[in-house]
Amino acid sequence: MAPGILGSPIHTHSREDELSYVVYGTVQAQVGEQVITAGPRDVIWKPRGVPHAFWNPGPERALILELIIPGGFERYFRELTALAQESNGPPDRSRMFDLQQRYGLDMDPSSIPTLMRRHNLRQPRM
């Protein structure tokens, strides 16, 4: 993850727990109302049902390994990639919403401006 990048807006998984293992760099996450800072070999636990977001606050690149439990959520990312490829850019919002609903994912795009301003972040390019 590039420096100063918002990895994801606030979102909630209804079926999965998520664990982020920091390989290198620094990552911050908002889990519920708590902001957690993690460095190499640290873990951030994001339980299902708890709104969370993550970003790279530092001046250096960061690498995280995401574990989403139970398995199967990787299909969401495959389908999201296919939607983006079909549209040659950001996917159609209604199709994205349908995809998120199928996977029990509740995204809060309205959180983006606040997260970016509060943590001095920018969005990745699509």
Label every model-predicted segment.
Residues 19, 26-28, 33-51:
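Short acidic-glycine-tyrosine-enriched beta hairpin
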Residues 28, 48-74:
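Ligand-binding loop in jelly-roll beta-barrel domains
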Residues 67-70, 74-87:
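A hydrophobic/aromatic-rich effector-binding and dimerization subdomain
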Residues 80-126:
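Acidic/histidine-enriched, glycine/proline-rich intrinsically disordered or flexible terminal extensions
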Residues 13-14, 62:
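Residue-level recognition of hydrophobic positions within alpha-helical transmembrane segments
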Residues 1-13:
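Conserved short histidine dyad/triad with adjacent acidic residue
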Residues 11, 17-21:
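Basic helix-turn-helix/winged-helix DNA-binding cores
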